[in-house]
Structures are given as structure tokens and as C-alpha cells.
UniProtKB/Swiss-Prot annotation:
EC number: 2.4.2.18
Any GO CC annotation of this UniProt entry: cytosol
Subunit structure, interactors included: Homodimer.
Keyword tRNA processing: no
Keywords linked to the UniProt accession: Amino-acid biosynthesis, Aromatic amino acid biosynthesis, Glycosyltransferase, Magnesium, Metal-binding, Transferase, Tryptophan biosynthesis
A Pfam family this chain is assigned to: Glycos_transf_3
Cofactor(s) this protein cannot do without: Mg(2+)
Positions with a binding annotation for anthranilate 2: R175
GO MF assignments: anthranilate phosphoribosyltransferase activity; magnesium ion binding
Protein name: Anthranilate phosphoribosyltransferase
Binding-site residues, Mg(2+) 2: D233, E234
Note accompanying the cofactor annotation: Binds 2 magnesium ions per monomer.
Positions contributing to anthranilate 1 binding: G89, N120
């Protein structure tokens, strides 16, 4: 396992210097190809973490992961006009909440958005998006062709990250051994193989909001809201949400309150989740229009911001109202049932 060709780049990192986007692409491409020892990988990730990753380094790492990903056939290979939105969080916020972004994906799709949600097994909560979907019989490892058909027919598909990003497995043991956040914690939401034009992206730290918006701009995302909601990696119902909105090539920063979104404040304890089976019951109740007010509102403000970002609603408040009416209609639950059926029709 030779890393001779990237040793000069590693030396730059060990000296506390920054890599260019192209250099970061090269070093992460080597990692994905399995050309890097675990010791070297650990040294690289820690060197980046201690200095603090730059916009170019995060962008270059994302470029490498995107280039190596299994193709999603719906994508036209760039960000031109596919109309797709992703509602995603980095995870790792330390709170064990209900599956807000996953549930919001069904609501946004039922309200007319085209949602390709890129997800993985749980990071911080007891039940990540894929854990929840398995409870409903949705085939997590559906082939790219099946996922594309789901997106065409139902406006919604789920892309299971390990199915598209095989090379990430090389970093698994090192990430577990380091027991600390690394660049990989923010890469997941940036490497959706559907290349969404629009994104609602939640981050685990307020310090990441602006940098990740800048990365999305560098990666060619058309419109996005990067959010951190009072400790959560999503739009908050229990406090203020920091936002960096990317629109027309500009990034503007502001804060949103629940009142701005047209809903009352709630306590974080009102959103506590459980094991996958319990969270599935909660999600089903919300999607049938029978959830608690706090649950429905938490999902609606996130779905609403996604509806705003992709242009279906002209404000976050209008988006939230549309999301709430969609929840009450039960359309989102019908969509869940249809997705379970279509996703499991053609198992590979």
C-alpha cells in the first residue's frame, strides 16, 4: 500500500498548511481507492481537524466522493435543471429526536417537491433515516434504477449512502477508532448521487452554517438553506435557527424563529424520539395527520423550508402552511405506502 504519490500533500498537512481543492481531491481519491494505510488516514484526518478544514478542502473531498460514486441514472451528471431537493442533516447533534427530516421528506414530496433523500444508518439518534424506513418495509438497498423509478412515479426516493459510496468503507475503522468528529461528518450531505439542485441542509454546529453554504456554492448547488436550530441539525421549533441561504450565487445570513414560520414555540423534550419501532409509530401518526401539534409543526417547518428552497412556496411561512395542510390531508402517508410497494417490487 504505497502513498508515495500523495506524501508531499500529507507533508503539507502535517506542517499545518492548507490544500487546494485539487490537492484535496487527489488525497481523498487515494483514500477511496484503498491506497492509504489506516495510520496515514488517521494522521490526515486529525491534521485537517486540528487546523480546521477550509472551503477548498471540503469541496475537494466532496468532489472525490462524487466522482467515485455509483451513478444515479436520474441525474444528468450536473446540477442543471433536475429540480431535485434533498432535506438532510449531518447528524451528530447529540439529541435523540424523532426523525424530523425523513418525515419532512414525505411531506415535501406529497406537496409537490421532487425529493431524493440521501441517508445512512443512525449517527446520533437511536433511529436514523434508514432504520426508520426499514420499519415501513422500504427497501434500503433498492437499486439505482428502482430509486430512479420511485422518483419519477412518486416524487420521492431514498438513496442509501453505502450503496453509492463503496470507497468510504476504507475509512470506517479509523473513524470509529478516533471517536471524534472528522471531515467525514460533514461530507455525507454533500455527496448525494442525485446531485440535487436544491438543499435544506442541517449542521450540528453553528460554526458550520456559513462554511457549508460556501461549499454548496462551490459545488454548484443552485439554491440552499444551511441551518442550525438551537443545538439541532434542522430548523428548530424550540428556539432560533441560524440560516445561511444561497440564492442567485449570493449567501445571506439571518435567523428564523418559530413565529417567523407561523407556528408556536415548543420544548425540545416534546420532540424526543425512541427506538426505530417507536419512531415509526410517531412518523405514521404525523403523516396520517394524527400527530401531536409539536411533532406536526416540527416536520412542517422543515418541509416548508424545503418547499421554499425549491420554489414551490414563495416564503418559508407559506411553505410551512402548505406542509401543514399536506399533513392534514393524509397524502404524505399514502406516499409512504406507495414507496414501500414500489421500492420492494424489484429487489436485486
Amino acid at each position: 500500500m504505497s502513498t508515495n504519490h500523495i506524501q508531499p500533500l500529507l507533508d503539507l498537512l502535517y506542517q499545518g498548511k492548507s490544500l487546494s481543492r485539487e490537492q484535496a481531491f487527489e488525497i481523498f481519491s487515494a483514500l477511496i481507492r484503498g491506497e492509504m494505510s489506516e495510520a496515514t488516514m488517521a494522521g490526515m484526518l486529525v491534521a485537517l481537524k486540528i487546523r480546521g478544514e477550509t472551503i477548498d478542502e471540503i469541496s475537494g473531498a466532496a468532489d472525490a466522493m462524487r466522482a467515485a460514486a455509483k451513478t444515479f441514472p436520474y441525474s444528468n451528471g450536473d446540477n442543471l435543471g433536475n429540480g431535485i431537493v434533498d432535506i438532510v442533516g449531518t447528524g451528530g447533534d447529540g439529541f435523540n429526536t424523532i426523525n424530523i427530516s425523513t418525515t419532512a421528506a414525505f411531506v415535501a414530496a406529497a406537496a409537490g417537491a421532487k425529493v431524493a433523500k440521501h441517508g445512512n444508518r443512525s449517527v446520533s439518534s437511536k433511529s436514523g433515516s434508514s432504520d426508520l424506513l426499514a420499519q415501513f418495509g422500504i427497501d434500503l438497498t433498492m437499486s439505482p434504477d428502482t430509486a430512479s423509478r420511485c422518483l419519477d412515479a412518486l416524487n420521492l426516493c431514498f438513496l442509501f449512502a453505502p450503496h453509492y459510496h463503496g470507497g468510504v468503507k476504507h475509512a470506517g475503522p479509523v473513524r470509529q477508532a478516533l471517536k471524534t468528529r472528522t471531515l467525514f461528518n460533514v461530507l455525507g450531505p454533500l455527496i448525494n448521487p442525485a446531485r440535487p439542485e436544491f438543499m435544506l441542509l442541517g449542521v450540528y454546529s453553528p460554526e458550520l452554517v456559513l462554511p457549508i453554504a460556501k461549499v454548496l456554492k462551490a459545488l454548484g448547488t443552485k439554491r440552499a438553506m444551511v441551518v442550525h436550530g438551537s443545538g439541532l441539525d434542522e430548523v428548530a421549533l424550540h428556539g432560533n435557527t441560524l440560516v445561511a441561504e444561497l440564492k442567485d450565487g449570493d449567501i445571506i445570513e439571518y435567523q428564523l424563529t418559530p413565529a417567523d414560520l407561523g407556528v408556536p414555540l415548543a420544548q425540545i423534550s416534546d420532540l424526543e424520539g425512541g427506538e426505530p419501532a417507536q419512531n415509526a409509530l410517531i412518523t405514521e401518526a404525523i403523516l396520517r395527520g394524527r400527530g401531536t401539534d409539536a411533532h406536526a409543526n416540527a416536520v412542517a417547518i422543515n418541509a416548508g423550508c424545503a418547499l421554499y428552497v425549491c420554489g414551490i412556496a414563495d416564503s418559508v411561512k407559506a411553505g410551512t402552511l402548505l406542509a401543514l395542510s399536506t399533513i392534514q390531508s393524509g397524502k404524505a402517508f399514502e406516499l409512504l405506502s406507495q414507496l414501500a410497494k414500489v421500492s420492494s417490487e424489484t429487489k436485486e
